[in-house]
Amino acid sequence: MQPELRTRATEVFGWTLRPDQESVIDAVLERRDALAVMPTGSGKSAIYQVAGLGLDGLVVVVSPLVALQEDQVVGLEHHSDAPRAVALNATKKARDVADAWDAVAAGEVGYVFLAPEQLVKDDVLERLRDAGVALVAVDEAHCISSWGHDFRPDYLALGEVAERLGRPPVLALTATGSAPVRDDIVERLGMRDPFVLASGFDRPGIRLEVVRHAEDAEKRQAVVDQVAELDGPTVVYVATRAATTEYADALAARGRRAQPYHAGMRVAEREAVHTGFLDGDVDVVVATSAFGMGIDKPDVRYVVHADVPESIDAYYQEIGRAGRDAEPAGATLHYRAEDFGLRTFFASGSPRPTSVRAVFDAVPATGSIARSALVEAAGLSARTAGRALNALLDAGALRDDVDGVSRVPDGPQDADRAARATADRAAERERVEESRIAMMRQLAETTGCRRQFLLGYFGDELPEPCGNCDTCSSGTAREASAHVADGANDAAWPPDARVEHAEWGTGVVMSTEEDRITVFFESAGYRTLALADVEQRDLLERV
């Protein structure tokens, strides 16, 4: 990185950047697309913030949560010499939004934070294009991947958004990008020869523990007993909104300053909890997965899961809220075997076929239609039409480009076939989600080193047990060392290698063990195969 920019970063933000951060910044300043996969708390936001100091134009930051947008704006405001930042979202008053746009037009703003559903609007794109965009930064970029654990269809339009903004460099940032997700991010954002940084996933300072329970009442009591005795800021993750209040009330009765948090609360209520936690007025936040992306609190000491997350990806991201100050932290998962059935139920859901057909029929057989006109033409609500359109785009039945939404020449040409294509895609994704839940069960039930298993899921192997998890402490990790991702067969089946299976199609090798291999298949999700079967029956072919 240029010495002048390095000095400027120190003067403005007080930061000394690491080489990996600088390498991504250099790529962006050379007008090259970049994908950075870095652990939670490793300074991903610093990349676009410092890059903004060296660019001539706006940095547009796509962020999925209002809380995350506001946190970043407040953080930048704490640095008096930093370029001005504004967040444009539905919680803002009309006057505040108008003032922010005036400042953008006048060249007084360096960073604009938006949600993806706002960024696709024609008037928003026109204003940004007129102001001049130097960089599009996509935060939580795994949300664009249908193979990611937090797929958000609104992200699908971002590749086209970049084109409509004049195709500035695109920077994608995420903490949970396994090889298949990284490939999907690059493809869906239309990235061109991107610089890809995938630093290690290990957070060795977080102690990993799992506790199995036979009964729900026993599990609930164990969670309350544990959290009531913990010392330090704590996040408790639960599966339902009702559980946030139940646990928060129980913990408050035990003397902890606990508050519930979920997406169904009013914005002001969520912000009050969020601010109270950051300021130290709230000790424990009991939350659904809605709480997390916007947390920039370095001294969280514990993350406790009262219910199993829907995937290892979600688990990894949520425990990553702990110990960002590099001090020791802990993560405990409480579960019953039945909890995995609950998560399987949560994994399903797709738009109605009638809505899909209506949207497909609203798109002309030749030519295109603007997104803004599609809602009225389909005769649906904006939300329903948007879900159906995203499903059709994801299935490859429609495409969205600078001219608008159009049919794919070699895709389905009638509504019934288009609806079947989206149903097939939904079934495919459900199989993938079920495989993620199965992998989460394996993590919970393994007697091997949990960190070895966790890292192996992401293709980041650990040769020896970590020494900082419950199975290492109990001694079972050493006894079970033949069944962990240790890279024993990497020579024949290296991580990230592409393979072909007769039934499941193309896949990517995630990790190998002494006697097995784990592969992610696009049509079937995660599958663990015995190496003896692979070799004797030629189940896999390198491609």
Task: For each feature predicted by the language model, list its residue ranges.
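Actinobacteria-biased recognition of intrinsically disordered, low-complexity terminal regions
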Residues: 1-3, 481-488, 540-543
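Helicase motor core with emphasis on the C-terminal RecA-like subdomain
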Residues: 3-11, 16-45, 51-57, 67-361, ...
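Gly/serine-rich nucleotide phosphate-binding loop at the start of the catalytic core
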Residues: 60
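Long, compositionally biased intrinsically disordered regions
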Residues: 246, 301, 491, 514-516
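C-terminal accessory region of SF2 helicases/translocases
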Residues: 282, 308-317, 323-500, 508-510, ...
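Basic/aromatic-rich interaction segments and small domains that mediate binding to polyanionic partners
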Residues: 502-543
